[in-house]
């Protein structure tokens, strides 16, 4: 996608320094566009935990390179396994991270230690390229849903969509998951409008999704997190579409905190609730998401403080709660499959159920 007319991926290896990677510092959006250089496993881990890089597919791709960096001086099995465990622990909820590391470890253990760094770069590059192709396919399948809504409306007015958090191109290597169909619909000439949940406490909707959509020229409106139900109740939402950090084998969906409340409101108002995801986000080893998906607890400061621009246009942080008030900060919640209209994957759409997922991924029936 583009920033100021220039095409970027959210992660790349510069041609003149192929032993490092570049990412955007997502904690600086939208006020500043800053590029970070990462060239060692510690820097990669810090970027993931600090959320300078975020989004389930993207952190998996970044971690893949981090594993290669860790092997520069010692490519033994012991070093490989130690680095893999270190990286997997950085964000416990997003399954793409574990998926990417497990894929890398399997590939690297198949070659001699002296060949692992070179083979690792090839595999990490492949993960990135595949992510772009997968997300483009998700976009095409989701676009069909938006077309259907537009046609049902007699091609009158606009298609109103609601999204939560950020599942756009900066959350993946390119295109995004939940936003990919929206970009394609807009580019096709379908008049879409997006209600953008602010997504407290880190405001990834108001800061990141709104910035992405605005940069692409997509009409949108930022709303308070608690306003979504009202807009659904008053007939101003045609479809909810979100991304996810982990989907279980029976279709439960872990996503940014607050997603479950949107699903409840959508269910109560007969608004379709769709989840867009690459197959790398499916955890075939877990069935009950509420019981078995670990939920990351982040710093209370993310709830107690807020960052924004002051009247002079300077970025700053202010406390928004009393000095003696504690805060809790679960980063994710789980939406039960019964509240999900369907899943949009690179292979097509399906019901949020074990049967639905296996209809698209029959090879997993035998594997698990």
From Swiss-Prot:
EC number: 5.3.1.23
Binding site for substrate: 54-56, 91, 204, 255-256
Isomerase recorded as keyword: yes
Broad class of enzyme this protein falls into: isomerase
Keyword hit for Amino-acid biosynthesis: yes
Single GO biological process annotation from the record: L-methionine salvage from methylthioadenosine
Active site: 245 (proton donor)
Highest taxon, organism lineage: Bacteria
Chain coiled-coil ranges: none
Site, as annotated: Transition state stabilizer: 165
Recorded metabolic or biological pathway in which this protein acts: Amino-acid biosynthesis; L-methionine biosynthesis via salvage pathway; L-methionine from S-methyl-5-thio-alpha-D-ribose 1-phosphate: step 1/6
Keywords: Amino-acid biosynthesis, Isomerase, Methionine biosynthesis
An annotated Gene Ontology molecular function: S-methyl-5-thioribose-1-phosphate isomerase activity
Record field: catalytic activity: 5-(methylsulfanyl)-alpha-D-ribose 1-phosphate = 5-(methylsulfanyl)-D-ribulose 1-phosphate
Family recorded in the similarity comment: Belongs to the eIF-2B alpha/beta/delta subunits family. MtnA subfamily.
HAMAP family cross-referenced by the UniProt entry: Salvage_MtnA
PANTHER family tied to this protein: METHYLTHIORIBOSE-1-PHOSPHATE ISOMERASE
Purpose of the protein: Catalyzes the interconversion of methylthioribose-1-phosphate (MTR-1-P) into methylthioribulose-1-phosphate (MTRu-1-P).
This protein's name: Methylthioribose-1-phosphate isomerase
UniProt organism field: Gluconobacter oxydans (strain 621H) (Gluconobacter suboxydans)
Recorded name of the encoding gene: mtnA
